[in-house]
Amino acid sequence: MNTQQLFREITQEQIKSDVPAFRPGDTVRVHVKVVEGTRERIQLFEGVVIKRHGGGISETFTVRKISYGVGVERAFPLHSPRVAQIEVVRYGKVRRAKLYYLRNLRGKAARIKEIRR
């Protein structure tokens, strides 16, 4: 067994199977496990997916939201044990894979059309 096969076998065990299908433009609610001292709690982060990057075990996605008038972006590893759950709230219709242009838009201009699924 060579190293590529070994690497593939190890990463296959770590990949989550309960990840919903979502794309850039979709609004998601990410349940993140946060450890504070000895306590562990779930923190929600809801926003628009502006990009997905990579593949396999190292795949990440970035979510953007506006909090108190300030844009906040957070990148999450898709298969991380810290990500407890991902819920798709809305499906958006966009024609780009990377939605960096949303960083420059404010208010109603930053809206994304919704697809009914």
UniProtKB/Swiss-Prot annotation:
Instruction: Provide the Gene Ontology terms for cellular component.
Output: cytosolic large ribosomal subunit
Q: Provide the function of this protein.
A: This protein is located at the 30S-50S ribosomal subunit interface and may play a role in the structure and function of the aminoacyl-tRNA binding site.
- Name the InterPro entries for this protein: Ribosomal_bL19, Ribosomal_bL19_CS, Ribosomal_bL19_sf, Translation_prot_SH3-like_sf
Q: Name it.
A: Large ribosomal subunit protein bL19
* Originating gene: rplS
Q: State the signal peptide span.
A: none
Ordered alphabetically, the record's keywords are:
Ribonucleoprotein, Ribosomal protein
Entries under SUPFAM superfamilies matching the protein: Translation proteins SH3-like domain (SSF50104)
Q: Which domain of life is it from?
A: Bacteria
Biological process (GO) annotations held by this record are:
translation
Q: Name one GO molecular function term.
A: structural constituent of ribosome
What S-S linkages are listed for this chain? none
UniProt keyword Ribonucleoprotein present: yes
Q: Which family does it belong to?
A: Belongs to the bacterial ribosomal protein bL19 family.
